[in-house]
């Protein structure tokens, strides 16, 4: 019968916390940039100017049709060359974390865009017409009238997508980036406690995701 050995967890906590910080950095960065870029894409897709709408639609369709792990690898290969040529960074600089942040931000923006677009379309067109009648421009009505109402209703959905993003960050193992999951796995391989460390990592992901889910449920009740 297998005997669990949890003794390596406590001594490894500093390394695990460092890995968790990297995971949270990727998550927070991708959520913030993803929502900002996703909002722009949503507005562009609703534009009456066809080329702009086509670009936004093509962007969303492309990123939603490609596996995330492939996007991570693409940006891992593209971003270093871009930064070296534009910013003059040395090839020796480790920019795996930046590559991961860019990849997740661009990928998640496609999903946030659809959430935000649906939120905008849920607002009565009468409000936009009333704003235009008062002398506001289209962009002013979008900024001051439509988006604030749409975001209030969308907060639970945006946070839910953020939870999915947090769980997906474990895929950065393909970049050999020492996030929380990879750190736990590496420690398990080193100490011969692979099962225990993976179970512990899963428990931490569960606790954080459950806490965030409870927050989402609370916000849903508040915004209902």
From Swiss-Prot:
<dbReference type="InterPro" id="IPR000515">
    <property type="entry name" value="MetI-like"/>
</dbReference>
<keyword id="KW-1133">Transmembrane helix</keyword>
<keyword id="KW-0029">Amino-acid transport</keyword>
<dbReference type="GO" id="GO:0098712">
    <property type="term" value="P:L-glutamate import across plasma membrane"/>
</dbReference>
<comment type="function">
    <text>Part of the ABC transporter complex GltIJKL involved in glutamate and aspartate uptake. Probably responsible for the translocation of the substrate across the membrane.</text>
</comment>
<feature type="topological domain" description="Periplasmic">
    <location>
        <begin position="176"/>
        <end position="196"/>
    </location>
</feature>
<dbReference type="GO" id="GO:0140009">
    <property type="term" value="P:L-aspartate import across plasma membrane"/>
</dbReference>
<feature type="transmembrane region" description="Helical">
    <location>
        <begin position="20"/>
        <end position="40"/>
    </location>
</feature>
<dbReference type="GO" id="GO:0016020">
    <property type="term" value="C:membrane"/>
</dbReference>
<dbReference type="Pfam" id="PF00528">
    <property type="entry name" value="BPD_transp_1"/>
</dbReference>
<feature type="topological domain" description="Cytoplasmic">
    <location>
        <begin position="41"/>
        <end position="67"/>
    </location>
</feature>
<feature type="topological domain" description="Periplasmic">
    <location>
        <begin position="89"/>
        <end position="94"/>
    </location>
</feature>
<dbReference type="InterPro" id="IPR010065">
    <property type="entry name" value="AA_ABC_transptr_permease_3TM"/>
</dbReference>
<feature type="transmembrane region" description="Helical">
    <location>
        <begin position="197"/>
        <end position="217"/>
    </location>
</feature>
<dbReference type="GO" id="GO:0055052">
    <property type="term" value="C:ATP-binding cassette (ABC) transporter complex, substrate-binding subunit-containing"/>
</dbReference>
<comment type="subunit">
    <text>The complex is composed of two ATP-binding proteins (GltL), two transmembrane proteins (GltJ and GltK) and a solute-binding protein (GltI).</text>
</comment>
<keyword id="KW-0997">Cell inner membrane</keyword>
<comment type="similarity">
    <text>Belongs to the binding-protein-dependent transport system permease family. HisMQ subfamily.</text>
</comment>
<feature type="transmembrane region" description="Helical">
    <location>
        <begin position="155"/>
        <end position="175"/>
    </location>
</feature>
<feature type="transmembrane region" description="Helical">
    <location>
        <begin position="68"/>
        <end position="88"/>
    </location>
</feature>
<keyword id="KW-0813">Transport</keyword>
<keyword id="KW-0472">Membrane</keyword>
<feature type="topological domain" description="Cytoplasmic">
    <location>
        <begin position="218"/>
        <end position="224"/>
    </location>
</feature>
<dbReference type="InterPro" id="IPR035906">
    <property type="entry name" value="MetI-like_sf"/>
</dbReference>
<feature type="transmembrane region" description="Helical">
    <location>
        <begin position="95"/>
        <end position="112"/>
    </location>
</feature>
<keyword id="KW-1003">Cell membrane</keyword>
<dbReference type="GO" id="GO:0022857">
    <property type="term" value="F:transmembrane transporter activity"/>
</dbReference>
<comment type="function">
    <text>(Microbial infection) Probably transports the toxic C-terminal region of CdiA from P.luminescens strain TTO1 across the inner membrane to the cytoplasm, where CdiA has a toxic effect. Toxin transport is strain-specific, mutations in this gene do not confer resistance to several other tested CdiA toxins.</text>
</comment>
<feature type="topological domain" description="Cytoplasmic">
    <location>
        <begin position="113"/>
        <end position="154"/>
    </location>
</feature>
<dbReference type="GO" id="GO:0005886">
    <property type="term" value="C:plasma membrane"/>
</dbReference>
<feature type="topological domain" description="Periplasmic">
    <location>
        <begin position="1"/>
        <end position="19"/>
    </location>
</feature>
<dbReference type="InterPro" id="IPR043429">
    <property type="entry name" value="ArtM/GltK/GlnP/TcyL/YhdX-like"/>
</dbReference>
<feature type="domain" description="ABC transmembrane type-1">
    <location>
        <begin position="20"/>
        <end position="216"/>
    </location>
</feature>
<keyword id="KW-0812">Transmembrane</keyword>
<dbReference type="GO" id="GO:0006865">
    <property type="term" value="P:amino acid transport"/>
</dbReference>
<protein>
    <recommendedName>
        <fullName>Glutamate/aspartate import permease protein GltK</fullName>
    </recommendedName>
</protein>
């Amino acid at each position: 019968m297998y005997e669990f050995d949890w003794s390596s967890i406590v001594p490894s906590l500093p390394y695990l916390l460092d890995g968790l910080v990297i995971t949270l950095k990727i998550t927070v960065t991708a959520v913030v940039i993803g929502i900002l870029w996703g909002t722009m894409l949503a507005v562009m897709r609703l534009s009456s100017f066809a080329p702009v709408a086509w670009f936004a639609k093509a962007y969303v369709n492309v990123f939603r049709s490609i596996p995330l792990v492939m996007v991570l690898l693409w940006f891992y290969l593209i971003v270093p060359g871009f930064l070296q040529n534009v910013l003059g960074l040395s090839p020796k600089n480790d920019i795996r974390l930046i590559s991961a942040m860019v990849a997740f931000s661009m990928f998640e923006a496609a999903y946030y865009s659809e959430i935000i677009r649906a939120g905008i379309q849920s607002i009565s067109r009468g409000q936009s017409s009333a704003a235009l009648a008062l002398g506001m421009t289209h962009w002013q009505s979008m900024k001051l009238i439509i988006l604030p109402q749409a975001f209030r209703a969308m907060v639970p959905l945006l946070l839910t997508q953020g939870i999915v993003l947090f769980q997906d960050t474990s895929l950065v193992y393909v970049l050999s980036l020492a996030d929380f999951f990879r750190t736990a796995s590496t420690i398990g391989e080193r100490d011969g406690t692979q099962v225990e460390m993976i179970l512990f990592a899963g428990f931490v992901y569960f606790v954080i995701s459950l806490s965030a889910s409870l927050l989402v449920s609370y916000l849903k009740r508040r915004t209902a």
